[in-house]
Amino acid sequence: VAAANRVAGEAALHAAAANQGAAHSGAIVTSIYAPKGGCGKTSIATNLATILSGEMKQRVCLLDLDLESGDVQLIMGLPPARSVLDLQNLTDSLDATALASVMLPHSSGTYVLAAPQRPEQAAAIRPHLISRIVNVASKMFDHVIIDCPPYATEHVLAVLDVTDHLGLICTPDAASVKNTAISLEVLTELNFNGSVDLIVNRAGERVGISGTDISEALDHPIT
């Protein structure tokens, strides 16, 4: 929750700055990514969404982009009623009405677009559809939060093009630090234009690499 609060604060600052600039229109898009599983990525994404909607009274949608094994719907206690799979045939004709019809409302005020219920259904979701969803959602909400899978898919690359704010999650172990370093290099190679917040989850544990050492190794400040 502490990590989500920090990212929420950053997102709010981005929103305030965007409101002052004529060049930016629509929602602030925040993508949460971890280069390996088990980093608490989905917990941070769901907490961030509920903080922004419940405490900060923002209009928020949460997109579960972990198409093969996403758990956002389950973690938030929502019924498996609808998902992104219901939009697979609406790529070019997708509009706000169609998108709203498949979103699941949470008690915090967040609207969730769930991942498919079965892994094999992920193949039906094209990257262009995800880009279209983010584009439409950006006109409906103040914040679009995207819970990315722990690997760089074409869908992830598609949303990076429209991401304002990337929460990059690392845990205090050598494997995670190595993979995070690679992720930072890839972002540079892709000329990623958004801001990158490095989040060390479980940084308060007595075992593992310290936050200071991680920041120095990655040459990047920790949020």
Labelled PLM ranges:
Residues 1-29, 189, 195-196, 200:
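Acidic-aromatic/histidine active-site loop/patch
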Residues 19-61:
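Walker A (P-loop) phosphate-binding motif
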Residues 55-112:
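Phosphate-binding loop that captures ATP/GTP phosphates
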